[in-house]
Amino acid sequence: MAITVRRSTMVRPAAERPRERLWNSNLDLVVPRFHTPSVYFYRRPDAGAGAGPGAAEGFFDAERMRRALAEALVPFYPMAGRLARDEDGRVEIDCSGEGVLFVEARAPGAAVDDYGDFAPTMELKRLIPAVDYSGDISSFPLLVLQVTYFKCGGVSLGVGMQHHVADGMSGLHFINSWSDLCRGAQIAVMPFIDRTLLRARDPPTPSYTHVEYQPAPAMLSSAPQALTGKPTLAPTAVDIFKLTRSELGRLRAQLPTGEGAPRFSTYAVLAAHVWRCVSLARGLPAEQPTKLYCATDGRHRLQPPLPEGYFGNVIFTATPLAEAGKVTGAVADGAAVIQGALDRMSDDYCRSALDYLETQPDLSALVRGAHTFRCPNLGLTSWVRLPIHDADFGWGRPVFMGPGGIAYEGLAFVLPSANKDGSLSIAISLQAEHMEKFRKLIADV
């Protein structure tokens, strides 16, 4: 699909403020160093969709969006800055007000429907501006945006947000606040911009082992050669799978019931199903250790809770670890392992994690990447509780929002339905051979 860029603008905050440097917590520094990609799709409202009079007027007017963006960057001023290093080499944010990239593009030969179920393939990634990382860390904007207009009248909004600046909750806080301003509303919750609340204790006193920061298990030497060979040589595939409300209900029906039966969250049950299917698709031996990475928002796990609107990264990681034979059996067995790891994520555990990171000589060594999630391991990040469908710029809510790409084999996302029908979707990257088997297994509930 041909995409033509019509205009690129660096949008600066609508009002200047004194330049400052923003200290990053340890949680801001152990995240991947690229821009997190996501894409929104919007259909042009019409009478048939039940839209009110004038709903399509000025549909995604670029000038209106730029003005609102400049206004949003005033309270969210770190977003308009650049990365920098302090005298010790620690990455921080230079709140320089240099602006964010806003691109207008057209895809005259494409329609929203051409993207099918919105699997995060390379076609979706083309809807987000590419970032040149070849220069110094101060050389690129922290936020890149692209509005692409399709022949059907629909629009996509591609977002690339540098992960040191914000996690999913904070990133959506910004995007949704921008959309509120564009719609003529006010920002509901102002950002809280002070990351020192997540400083480690002095002196740091970690009280747990923190397996989440230990190296991921490797394939056992006794495993089949197809699994122990160089993983970088295996082609990967990306796909998305929908589980309906009734299918999710059938998953729950597999759990024990009655007095004294364990209680599992929806995430634990679904994650157990995905972990089981991935392990079976990969053909893992029963004795093979496998680790599941579960991103966990610490905003309300910390006590006292962080202020509403805290802007930054507050993602801790629960990491259930088990032998494959444990997770390829009954769903309840895997769910018990997962729920146990999630239940351990208390204030005490999270504070200990901050202290543990403070004691590490090189935080960059703990940044997760391809080596973390590849076979035999898995990352499963849930966006179910995030307000991913709230970005109404004045022309209606998105019909889809999800990742604009999946960087690593073995990484997956859980997405809620835009129409609130109770279904959940799994976007995942696996080795192509394993994906064929996973496709059959995931639907077998």
Curated annotation (Swiss-Prot):
SUPFAM superfamilies referenced in this protein's UniProt entry, alphabetically: CoA-dependent acyltransferases
Keywords: Acyltransferase, Plant defense, Transferase
Induction data: Induced by the crown rust fungus Puccinia coronata.
GO biological process: defense response
Reactions performed catalytically: 5-hydroxyanthranilate + (E)-4-coumaroyl-CoA = avenanthramide A + CoA; 5-hydroxyanthranilate + (E)-caffeoyl-CoA = avenanthramide C + CoA
InterPro entries in the record: CAT-like_dom_sf, Plant_Fungal_Acyltransferase
Organism superkingdom: Eukaryota
Name of a matching Pfam family: Transferase
GO molecular function, one term: acyltransferase activity, transferring groups other than amino-acyl groups
Leader sequence segment: none
Cited Gene3D superfamilies: Chloramphenicol acetyltransferase-like domain (3.30.559.10)
Enzymatic class: transferase
The enzyme's E.C. designation: 2.3.1.302
Reported function: Involved in the biosynthesis of avenanthramide phytoalexins, which are phenolic alkaloids found mainly in oats. Catalyzes the N-acylation of 5-hydroxyanthranilate with 4-coumaroyl-CoA or caffeoyl-CoA as acyl donors, forming avenanthramide A and avenanthramide C, respectively. Does not accept feruloyl-CoA as a substrate.
Similarity comment: Belongs to the plant acyltransferase family.
PANTHER family found in the cross-reference section: SHIKIMATE O-HYDROXYCINNAMOYLTRANSFERASE, TRICHOTHECENE 3-O-ACETYLTRANSFERASE
Protein's name according to its UniProt entry: Hydroxycinnamoyl-CoA:5-hydroxyanthranilate N-hydroxycinnamoyltransferase HHT4
Gene name for this UniProt entry: HHT4
